[in-house]
A protein has these predicted regions:
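N-terminal/domain-start alpha-helical segments
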Residues: 1-123
Length: 129
């Protein structure tokens, strides 16, 4: 099952997002701060990270930077920050997509599936020889 880490400090939002994604067949884990998100990422394996930019303790930008030092797991920034500068910075730091709130649930699920499809075959396969 595809595992998604949601790093989002608004509990009602993260609960609704988890419900939506679990209904679509994904397994989710939620972290409410940047620090907790990095800790969760380091202790478990995830196929994708949904990352809010405005989170406590460590900013979403710094979380993205930290994850990128050790992993190429897909990151989708999911945030209310919708300026062109924010989008460009997020993508240049290594985000694979950038979705602004409010968003369409159908569009978000489609973007998640598209990013996961783009993963390289050697990244998603395990050697069973």
């Amino acid at each position: 099952m595809t595992r998604i880490l949601i790093i989002e400090d608004e509990i009602s939002f993260s609960e609704a997002l988890s419900f939506l994604l679990e209904k679509e067949g994904f397994e989710t884990e939620v972290a409410e701060t940047g620090k907790a998100g990095i800790a969760s990422f380091n202790k478990s394996t995830f196929d994708l990270v949904l990352l809010d930019l405005m989170i406590p303790e460590i900013s979403g930008i710094d979380v993205c930077r930290t994850i990128r030092t050790s992993s190429q797991v897909p990151i989708i920034m999911l945030t209310a920050k919708d300026s062109e500068v924010d989008k460009v910075v997020g993508l240049e730091l290594g985000a694979d997509d950038y979705v602004t709130k409010p968003y369409s649930a159908r569009e978000l699920v489609a973007r998640i599936k598209a990013v996961l499809r783009r993963g390289t075959p050697e990244d998603s396969s395990t050697s069973e020889s």
